[in-house]
Amino acid sequence: MVTLEKIELKNFKSFKKLSLDIPKGFTAIVGPNGSGKSNIVDAILFVLGKTSAKKLRANRFSGLITYHNGKRADFAEVCLYFTNENNAFNVNADKVGILRRIKSSGETDYYLVWKENDKEKRKKMTKHEIIDLFRRLGLLGDNVISQGDLLKIINISPIERRKIIDEISGIAEFDEKKKKAEEELKKARELIEMIDIRISEVENNLKKLKKEKEDAEKYIKLNEELKAAKYALILKKVSYLNVLLENIQNDIKNLEELKNEFLSKVREIDVEIENLKLRLNNIINELNEKGNEEVLELHKSIKELEVEIENDKKVLDSSINELKKVEVEIENKKKEIKETQKKIIENRDSIIEKEQQIKEIEEKIKNLNYEKERLKEAIAESESIIKHLKESEMEIADEIAKNQNELYRLKKELNDLDNLINRKNFEIEKNNEMIKKLKEELETVEDVDTKPLYLELENLNVEIEFSKRGIKELEEKKKELQAKLDELHAEYVKENARIKALKEMEELSMDRAIREILNANLPGIIDIVGNLGKTKIEYKTAIEVAAGNRLNHIVVKRMDDAVRAIKYLKERKLGRATFLPLDRIEGREAYYIDEDGVIGRAIDLVEFDEKYRRVFEYVFGNTVVVENIDIAKELAKKYRKVRFVTLDGDVIEPSGAMIGGTFKSKAKIKVDVDLSKLNKIADEIIAIESELRKIKEEIERLSKIVKRSSAKKMEIENTLEIIKKNEMRKREIAEKNTIKIKELELKNKDILEELEELNLKREEILNRINEIESKINELIERREKIINELKEYESDENLKRMNEIEGELKILEKEKAKLKNEIDKGLTLVKEILIPKIEELNKKVSELINKKVILEKNISFYKESIEKNLSILEEKRKRYEELAKNLKELTEKKEQLEKEIETLERERREILRKVRDIENRINELMVEKAKYESKLEEEERKLYLCEKVDVSKELEKKDIEELEIYIGELENEIKSLEPVNMRAIEDYNYVAERYKELIEKRKEYERDEKKYLQLMEELENKKKEVFMEVFNKVAKNFEEVYKEIGGIGKLSLENEKNPFEGGILIDASPRGKKLLSLDAMSGGEKSLTALAFLFAIQRLNPSPFYVLDEVDAALDVKNVSLIADMIKNASKDSQFIVISHREQMVSKADVVYGVYMENGLSKVVGIRL
């Protein structure tokens, strides 16, 4: 442990220069009031780091610099020198000083001072470094104890007293650790709170997505079921239509067989009727021979009518059926006419072009024939041979032309076929490109990753929730602070009014003469006494009574100044005033009285500049201030030369006169107005207003966050909704594209089948072309041989030219023939085929129309004829019956035959009717078959387009009607679910996974929370353990210390179970008295107990040195001796520097320093006892 060896002061307060050795043991410093002895204590505190000038009894730090002879020094410095035991200061020196220097600007600096090789070295230190150094040395200013500190210990609450033990026990370390744990706990709880918000948001999303996911799953399931049902329905329909077509085919086959049976039977009946008719004719011949002509004629006419009626009926039925066919044929022929007319227009355009070419060729032929006629005369021989060869050549040429025409036709057909094949291939390519494009569209339909959006939405909700909570908390805090601000404003107004009132009272206390002198600016005038000093509010009444009117006396520098002022008053008749010249005024020093109830000498209760000390000694003289009149009365008996004034203004004069009663203050002395409260209130107001501004700014910031995040949240939610709709649209596009692809693939399949047929046909045409080309080549060879023979006969020039002309003519004729042939073909096609075809078609249409008209007329005619003939038949039969009676037997035979014939004919007609019915039924079945074949083709197309799916047994059991009803129900149910968010399944799975992550994270945070709670509990237990250990030691020390001074002392906890929820109580029994609490003790007993408490703490953790400043002021003689012995004993372990006026204390010191004032500066003289 280091030792304080020396204190050095330069220009510090009342000391110009001082070097004070501090030996080990007990050092006392004595001196009269105002001598400056307490300035030594201030010097020590100054170095130990006091940051407030007021605590060093100065208005500002620059006020610590010595002021002498009207001039302030440039700086002040104080240095404390310590032994450097165990290299405590980390420098190579036996003695190290800690120096603090202050400049006139108020700025202070720290230095570490030591000697190295007899040279002084200084190292500048920061305040922080110095404080750390003092902390290591155990010197933090709490080893300096003043009478005020004793009062503080006496007056502090038990809680604050416990806090002293808290500090010395070092449990702040646990508090710091606990605070850190609390911060971590707070963080963990904030994280739990934050994650709860996230979980809540994710739960909400999960609930919303769950419904959408279930809908999507249901939608998928229903769509799959719908696909299966549709697939099953198509399969059922295909199967049903195949069975139906098979049944229809079987029905047609059976009907054809039945029709053939009926027709065979008709032929048999016809044979039988023919036989019966032969027999009937024989009978008729016999009747003719035997009967009259009329009967026979009637019979004949009847039979003819019957036959005619029957034939008319057949014709009528046939005409009706024919009419239907004619109507259909008319429509077909009209379509064919339109197509043929289109071909005629195309051929006519071609013919016109070729006719123009023929005209040009004919002009060339005409010119060549003219030349040929001239050459003919010269040519006589070889004509017959040439003619024969030419005829042969012409026949071959015609054959070649014929084959070439056929070849041209085939090549044209081949070209048309190739064009058709190319168109088909182009169509396939176009379809393939479309399929590729559609597939690319399907590939480009990418899913949008919504995970970041949901995560951002979650973060935004957390931000919004926390911001809202923050706003709510801030609003509450703002409300509380506003209420507190209102209270502080009211308190400020009240305190300010009080201070203002005090100042106004001070101004009103002056009479006119004093005010005039003070305002006259006369030389040497200083001020009135009351303005040169100030006291505390609690001493105001006592001081004003003690000083009386002397407080209004005017202080001047010299007597001449007083004379000048008096003349000034006389000349102006301003009244009277009392003047106190500093060069002549003398006062009396008051006695020191150490008794219970004594507050102090009146002069000591007033603060003033030392240069005015004689003025205040004159004003107060031997006046002592005591607590009350009873104490004054007792002390007046003992101290007869002392004037006693009580705190409430009662007076006992040395003469025995007593003055008392109600006193009305006139504010003659300045009160040491405590502006700290007002300043504190103002500081609090400023702090709260600043905090309110920050809160408002924070609320605005959080509100902006809420607004911005809410807008962003809405934007994300809208984005998710758009994504949802886009997903549906993409799915619809994908479904449409898939169907379209299959349709195009099916179309390509049909085209490929068609191309296969066209390619086969092309092969056939190519084969035929090859055959014709081979034949043409053969004919050309034969023709070339004939031409070579002709060349032999055409060797002369005329013949050669004739041959050339013939050749040219042949070529031209050939071209002309070819063109004519083409024209003829075109004309033939138009005239003989197309126009006749149109004419034929028109004729056919006309015929069909005429036929239709005729048929309609025939139908009308035959209906009328049948009705007319039936009427005539009826009449003839009546006549015949009358005539037939005579030829009964023959007639009966005849009638029998006729009946048989009629029966057979009726049977024949019935059979033929059945045949017609069968044919009609066959036609109906054929139509029905075509319809069902078309339906089957459509269903098979659908089956191809459909994706193959597994069909459940339940669907297989349903028939077509049940499936159609079921499909309708499924479609309605699917429609009711739309629109469906198909991403909901993926989003739900992501959010569910996120939910699990958050739950796990929450458990982790809960574990952290539990860990920090456990740590806090452990720290609290350890803190209590350490505190109790220190408290028990201090309590034991307190008992021992109190025992040493002849009494019984006890420290106890208000709350033994939880000491930090209560304070420390002090109970003591001073010598010869019962056990009392601190509140029940007298002032001296309280001081003694406070000192005992301080010594108990000192014994626990001794500091290198202690400074005690007039801590014995309130003690009686006996207790001062006890405390002095205690200090003497404690000084064996630590240095003690004691400021005291008490003889009992000073007499026990090892070294005594006396402080005195000389020419306004403090001096020190030392005595070793």
UniProtKB/Swiss-Prot annotation:
Keywords from the named record: ATP-binding, Coiled coil, Cytoplasm, DNA-binding, Nucleotide-binding
Report the InterPro entries cross-referenced here: P-loop_NTPase, RecF/RecN/SMC_N, SMC, SMC_hinge, SMC_hinge_sf, SMC_prok
Instruction: Cite the binding residues for ATP.
Output: P32, N33, G34, S35, G36, K37, S38, N39
For this protein, the record's Pfam families field holds: SMC_hinge, SMC_N
Signal peptide bounds: none
Coiled-coil region: 166-507, 676-1030
Annotated GO biological process: chromosome condensation; chromosome segregation; DNA replication; sister chromatid cohesion
* Compartments, as annotated in UniProt: Cytoplasm
Task: Name the GO cellular-component terms.
Answer: chromosome; cytoplasm
Q: Enumerate the GO terms in the molecular function aspect.
A: ATP binding; ATP hydrolysis activity; DNA binding
- Which positions fall inside the SMC hinge domain? 523-636
The domain of life for this entry's organism is Archaea
Family membership noted in the UniProt record:
Belongs to the SMC family.
| Domain characteristics, as noted in the entry | Contains large globular domains required for ATP hydrolysis at each terminus and a third globular domain forming a flexible SMC hinge near the middle of the molecule. These domains are separated by coiled-coil structures.
Assembly description: Homodimer.
Which HAMAP family does the annotation name? Smc_prok
Q: What does this protein do?
A: Required for chromosome condensation and partitioning.
Question: Could you identify this protein by its name?
Answer: Chromosome partition protein Smc
Which organism is this entry from? Methanocaldococcus jannaschii (strain ATCC 43067 / DSM 2661 / JAL-1 / JCM 10045 / NBRC 100440) (Methanococcus jannaschii)
Organismal lineage: Archaea, Methanobacteriati, Methanobacteriota, Methanomada group, Methanococci
